[in-house]
C-alpha cells in the first residue's frame, strides 16, 4: 500500500539532527532510536495510517528502548473494532528509486538485518521524506519475497555497505516496482511449491564474489 501525504505548512515537520543521515544506514541502536524519535511526531504519519485504515482510532508511538523497539515496533495502531496492528517506521531523507533491504546488521558476525530476522511488527512503513510518499509493506509477504528472490536481487542490484565503528552492515537496493511485484507474487501460496532455503545460509557478497 502506498500513500502520499502533505505536511501542514504552518508547523514544520521535525527533521533529524544531521543532514543526509538515513534510517537504517547506521545501525548503532541508540543512534537509530534517536533518529526514529526525531521523526516520530512528523505530521504525515496519522494521515498515512488513516488512508490505510479508515477506522483508525489511535496510533501510539513507542519510543522507549525495550522489547517492542528491538522487535521492530515503532507504533501501535488500534481500529474501532479493537483490532491492533504494529508498525516499524523507516524514513529515507533522499528520494532514492529503491527500497534498501538490510541483509546483514553486522556482516562479520553474521547478525541478520531486518529483512531476514524475525520481526514482531505487522507492517513496515517505508517513507521518503522529500517526496512525501510512504510504502506500507506487509512483513510476512515481504520477507517471503526476500526468501524467494534474495539471491537474484543481490546479483542484479548489488549491495550497499555502511561502515561503522567495529562492524559493517549490508543492504540490497531493490527497485520499488520490482519489490512490489515480488510481494504480490509472495502472497500466492501452493502446497506443491518447493520450500525456500533461508537467506541466512547465503554467503556474504564478498565471499561469493558478487558484483557491487
Report residues per predicted region.
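Intrinsically disordered, low-complexity regions of eukaryotic proteins
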Residues: 11-12, 76, 90, 104, ...
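Short beta-strand or tight-loop elements
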Residues: 71-73, 120
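Catalytic cores of nucleic-acid endonucleases
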Residues: 28-33, 90-134
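Acidic-basic catalytic patches of nuclease active cores, encompassing PD-(D/E)XK
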Residues: 3-4, 8-11, 17-69, 93, ...
Amino acid at each position: 500500500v502506498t500513500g502520499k501525504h502533505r505536511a501542514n505548512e504552518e508547523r514544520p515537520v521535525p527533521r533529524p539532527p544531521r543532514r543526509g543521515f538515513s534510517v537504517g544506514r547506521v545501525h548503532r541502536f541508540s543512534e537509530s532510536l534517536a533518529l526514529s524519535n526525531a521523526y516520530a511526531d512528523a505530521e504525515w504519519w496519522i494521515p498515512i495510517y488513516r488512508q490505510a485504515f479508515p477506522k483508525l482510532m489511535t496510533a501510539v508511538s513507542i519510543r522507549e528502548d525495550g522489547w517492542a523497539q528491538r522487535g521492530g515496533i515503532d507504533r501501535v495502531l488500534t481500529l474501532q473494532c479493537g483490532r491492533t496492528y504494529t508498525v516499524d517506521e523507516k524514513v529515507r531523507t533522499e528520494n532514492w528509486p529503491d527500497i534498501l533491504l538490510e541483509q546483514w546488521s553486522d556482516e562479520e558476525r553474521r547478525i541478520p538485518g531486518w529483512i531476514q530476522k524475525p520481526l514482531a511488527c505487522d507492517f513496515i512503513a517505508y517513507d521518503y521524506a522529500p517526496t512525501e510518499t510512504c510504502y506500507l509493506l506487509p512483513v510476512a509477504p515481504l520477507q517471503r519475497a526476500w526468501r524467494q528472490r534474495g539471491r537474484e536481487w543481490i546479483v542484479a542490484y548489488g549491495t550497499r555497505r555502511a561502515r561503522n565503528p567495529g562492524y559493517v552492515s549490508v543492504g540490497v537496493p531493490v527497485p520499488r516496482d520490482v519489490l512490489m511485484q515480488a510481494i504480490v507474487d509472495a502472497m500466492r501460496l501452493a502446497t506443491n511449491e518447493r520450500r525456500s532455503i533461508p537467506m541466512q545460509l547465503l554467503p556474504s557478497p564478498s565471499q561469493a564474489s558478487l558484483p557491487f
